[in-house]
């Protein structure tokens, strides 16, 4: 169950290095137009110290957190931001969508399978702080809007990511490869 925070908040979870697009995220959230949105950053990495020094009071660095803490942050966040420069298919996007969060992400990577632009989140260009900021502004206007977008295609994502269905699909593919007709 979700219990979103009363004020707009969002989450980034991942390794703090360039491929994740984290510097563009921090740049977006240091802009005065997002000072009312709390950004929680879970993870550690090479860029953390440098980016933390640039942060404004609305950016909170959590470091490495437990699975339970991650679930708690997913439960209270209005949305997830994953501004990757190139990810195969990040688990955090899948987890967020299964929990009913809208996601701001880029067109680079497999996560676009779970996010429909303008419907269940926003797909922004890579390396574009202004686009991240604009999408975050849209999602932070109203909790009702964020919740509504999060529920779009929610059941479809749950079905796609169901463990039984995933295992059955993999076994079926292996069977087809091993025993071609």
Question: Where are the predicted features?
Answer:
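A conserved mid-protein helix/loop that constitutes part of the nucleotide-sugar donor-binding site
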Residues: 8, 12-31, 41, 46-49, ...
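Nucleotide-activated donor-binding/catalytic signature segment of Leloir-type glycosyltransferases, i.e.
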Residues: 49-68
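Short alpha-helical donor nucleotide-sugar binding micro-motif in glycosyltransferases
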Residues: 64-65, 72-77
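Short alpha-helical segment that forms part of, or immediately flanks, the ligand-binding pocket
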Residues: 71, 90-98, 112-113, 119
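Aromatic "clamp/platform" in nucleotide-sugar-dependent glycosyltransferases that forms part
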Residues: 85
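Short hydrophobic beta-strand element within catalytic cores of glycosyltransferases
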Residues: 102-105
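Conserved acidic donor-binding segment of nucleotide-sugar-dependent glycosyltransferases
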Residues: 117-118, 122-129, 138-143
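A charged, aromatic-enriched C-terminal amphipathic alpha-helix characteristic of glycosyltransferases
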Residues: 144-175
